[in-house]
């Protein structure tokens, strides 16, 4: 990392519904700015510690509600990174539905990509961002992607994924996620496949650095 003596790191917020392509967009930004000092910070890492709850209680939690996240910790650690201080990033265990005992040591970088479904819901988080991006993708495509991801990567069953989508993911998207589109500086249709939007975004970041 080369510390910028004239300003703090640049923070890019990437949000959108579950399965919208946020990770693809974040990775595309990361790859296009590969000559820079970057890191990706995912909101999913900051789900609440639920180790004191039973497994049945954990299953009943609405993971698509803002209160499911330890936003205070996320804000604290972003501020540490903005001050060029390292952090111990939490690790979330998707199979146990709680935070792992492990952490990941993360050194500060000149560009911080913050990714998550609800990162624009909290004004304190928005105020830390230089550029805010909303990835806008059709509902049908998002649910198909979520089913494929959760079964393959998170050990979920088809019934549990569909049940969660209908019970919480879809209604919470319309209640909390979609309204945050108004805070976005850039709305990206078609996610990471939108090369024009990615080029515009990375050009803007280079102009700030």
UniProtKB/Swiss-Prot annotation:
<dbReference type="InterPro" id="IPR000764">
    <property type="entry name" value="Uridine_kinase-like"/>
</dbReference>
<protein>
    <recommendedName>
        <fullName>Uridine kinase</fullName>
        <ecNumber>2.7.1.48</ecNumber>
    </recommendedName>
</protein>
<dbReference type="GO" id="GO:0005524">
    <property type="term" value="F:ATP binding"/>
</dbReference>
<dbReference type="GO" id="GO:0005737">
    <property type="term" value="C:cytoplasm"/>
</dbReference>
<feature type="binding site">
    <location>
        <begin position="16"/>
        <end position="23"/>
    </location>
    <ligand>
        <name>ATP</name>
    </ligand>
</feature>
<keyword id="KW-0963">Cytoplasm</keyword>
<comment type="pathway">
    <text>Pyrimidine metabolism; UMP biosynthesis via salvage pathway; UMP from uridine: step 1/1.</text>
</comment>
<dbReference type="GO" id="GO:0044206">
    <property type="term" value="P:UMP salvage"/>
</dbReference>
<keyword id="KW-0418">Kinase</keyword>
<keyword id="KW-0547">Nucleotide-binding</keyword>
<dbReference type="Pfam" id="PF00485">
    <property type="entry name" value="PRK"/>
</dbReference>
<dbReference type="InterPro" id="IPR006083">
    <property type="entry name" value="PRK/URK"/>
</dbReference>
<dbReference type="GO" id="GO:0044211">
    <property type="term" value="P:CTP salvage"/>
</dbReference>
<dbReference type="InterPro" id="IPR027417">
    <property type="entry name" value="P-loop_NTPase"/>
</dbReference>
<keyword id="KW-0067">ATP-binding</keyword>
<keyword id="KW-0808">Transferase</keyword>
<comment type="pathway">
    <text>Pyrimidine metabolism; CTP biosynthesis via salvage pathway; CTP from cytidine: step 1/3.</text>
</comment>
<comment type="similarity">
    <text>Belongs to the uridine kinase family.</text>
</comment>
<dbReference type="GO" id="GO:0004849">
    <property type="term" value="F:uridine kinase activity"/>
</dbReference>
<dbReference type="InterPro" id="IPR026008">
    <property type="entry name" value="Uridine_kinase"/>
</dbReference>
<dbReference type="GO" id="GO:0043771">
    <property type="term" value="F:cytidine kinase activity"/>
</dbReference>
């Amino acid at each position: 990392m080369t510390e910028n003596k004239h300003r703090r790191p640049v923070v890019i917020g990437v949000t959108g519904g579950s399965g919208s392509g946020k990770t693809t967009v974040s990775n595309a930004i990361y790859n296009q700015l590969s000559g820079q000092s970057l890191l990706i910070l995912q909101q999913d890492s900051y789900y609440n510690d639920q180790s004191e709850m039973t497994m049945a209680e954990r299953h009943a939690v609405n993971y698509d509600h803002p209160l499911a996240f330890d936003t205070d910790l996320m804000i604290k650690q972003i501020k540490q990174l903005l001050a060029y201080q390292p952090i111990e990033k939490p690790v979330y265990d998707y199979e146990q539905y709680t935070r792992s005992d492990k952490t990941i040591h993360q050194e500060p970088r000149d560009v911080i990509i913050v990714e998550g479904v609800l990162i624009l819901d909290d004004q304190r988080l928005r105020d830390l961002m230089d550029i805010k991006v909303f990835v806008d993708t059709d509902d049908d495509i998002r649910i198909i992607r979520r089913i494929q991801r959760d079964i393959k990567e998170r050990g979920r069953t088809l019934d549990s994924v569909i049940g969660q989508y209908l019970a919480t993911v879809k209604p919470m998207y319309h209640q909390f996620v979609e309204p945050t589109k108004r805070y976005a500086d850039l709305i990206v249709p078609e996610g990471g496949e939108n090369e024009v939007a990615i080029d515009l975004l990375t050009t803007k970041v280079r102009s700030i650095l």
